[in-house]
Amino acid sequence: MIQQESRLKVADNTGAKEILCIRVLGGSSRRYAGIGDVIVATVKDAIPGGNVKRGDVVKAVVVRTVKERRRPDGSYIKFDENAAVIIKPDNDPRGTRIFGPVGRELREKRFMKIISLAPEVL
């Protein structure tokens, strides 16, 4: 569960290392974001020479959360960290590589480019 002021690790090669959620998209009173949800975030830590700079406001999709999520078959999935992938306005990733596993919920939300770049889909 990601909410305003949550910090997430960036799981791609855009140059950002950490982002801070400033808004959960999907309704005026929406409070939490889970795997596959889009957030607006600001870059808090970045490497020099990357595509994004510290202070940039970006859109990102959540790919891993520490809070467990119940699947329709009754199983639960949770990860060791909160992570997101920075996306363009057309929902394609800005980076060319994805690091670490991503949740299967991204396939249901039609983030196929992220699914194809990810090394593992859980």
UniProtKB/Swiss-Prot annotation:
Give GO terms for biological process.
Answer: translation
ATP-binding listed as a keyword: no
Q: According to its UniProt record, what is one Pfam family this protein matches?
A: Ribosomal_L14
In terms of InterPro entries, this protein maps to: Ribosomal_uL14, Ribosomal_uL14_bac-type, Ribosomal_uL14_CS, Ribosomal_uL14_sf
Annotated keywords: Ribonucleoprotein, Ribosomal protein, RNA-binding, rRNA-binding
Q: List the disulfide bonds.
A: none
Record's GO cellular component terms: cytosolic large ribosomal subunit
| A GO MF label | structural constituent of ribosome
Instruction: Give the protein's biological function.
Output: Binds to 23S rRNA. Forms part of two intersubunit bridges in the 70S ribosome.
Listed under subunit, the entry gives: Part of the 50S ribosomal subunit. Forms a cluster with proteins L3 and L19. In the 70S ribosome, L14 and L19 interact and together make contacts with the 16S rRNA in bridges B5 and B8.
Q: Which family does it belong to?
A: Belongs to the universal ribosomal protein uL14 family.
The name on file for this protein is Large ribosomal subunit protein uL14
Name the species this protein comes from: Mycobacterium tuberculosis (strain ATCC 25177 / H37Ra)
